């Protein structure tokens, strides 16, 4: 019940052009608000640092660099986006990693607010649910540099210019 109410709330915010940034579950909620599918991925868990290719739309928003490295922890994934939405970052594991859904909605599957230490602790806490080889690969990936600051800088500008 509460998820459908949250989806309706996001749709309302979008209709009146109030800027919103969604993280992980928020990314999935925005997909539902745009009548897209969210499903448990056949690829399994995504944990650790995910490397994602930036698109031209991402550069148009002010992103820099060749890739977007960000911590993830998810099984569910967005399965499609509307034609009018802009794909910002993608990977083979998560094709719709970051999306600008409209002039006021933008979201990401990753966690720009997390530290590597938190991700490591969460993976260790979930050893009963996540396959050992997935956790080991996730822990090894934590050595990759994160792009959180640059990402959050672009998102801050997006939110402030729309406010």
Language-model features: locations:
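Cysteine-nucleophile active-site neighborhood
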Residues: 1-57
């Amino acid at each position: 019940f509460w998820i459908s109410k949250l989806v309706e709330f996001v749709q309302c915010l979008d209709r009146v052009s109030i800027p919103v940034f969604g993280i992980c579950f928020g990314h999935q909620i925005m997909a539902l608000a745009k009548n897209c599918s969210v499903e448990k991925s056949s690829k399994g868990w995504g944990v650790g640092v995910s490397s994602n290719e930036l698109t031209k739309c991402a550069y148009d928003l002010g992103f820099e660099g060749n890739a977007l490295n960000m911590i993830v922890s998810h099984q569910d994934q967005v399965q499609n986006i509307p034609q009018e939405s802009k794909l910002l970052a993608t990977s083979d594991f998560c094709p719709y990693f970051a999306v600008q859904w409209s002039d006021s909605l933008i979201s990401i599957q990753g966690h720009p607010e997390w530290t590597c230490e938190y991700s490591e602790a969460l993976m260790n806490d979930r050893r009963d649910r996540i396959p050992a080889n997935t956790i080991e690969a996730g822990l090894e990936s934590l050595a990759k540099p994160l792009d959180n600051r640059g990402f959050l800088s672009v998102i801050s500008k997006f939110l402030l210019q729309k406010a």
